[in-house]
């Protein structure tokens, strides 16, 4: 059995995004779309999604997030972020990557009722870098958490 092999651009995956809710372990990860031949492979990256109850047996679920189109803030790829559950919904905060935008990397938001079908926030990007404090590039990878006590 071949456990390790060099991956092609089309097989690229990375940045595991773990999440645990109601007895299930979820792993979201950045995955290059099938047939990717561009370099770097992270262009047009999607969020894959797998779930397990025991961390041994995994079920691959439908792709959670896809890049946008045209001048949308995530048109060049959906990059790393984090997932929380709060106020009856799943929330994904992720890096929107768009090569043609003034701010190439921004923070975007998507929600889901069931953790499988996601809807991007019409207000995306929800956060852009303050250029006087942060770079336009390398401003990414949001980590959020839900505070049960304060409900926020």
Residue spans for each PLM region:
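Beta-rich carbohydrate-recognition and catalytic domains
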Residues: 1-152
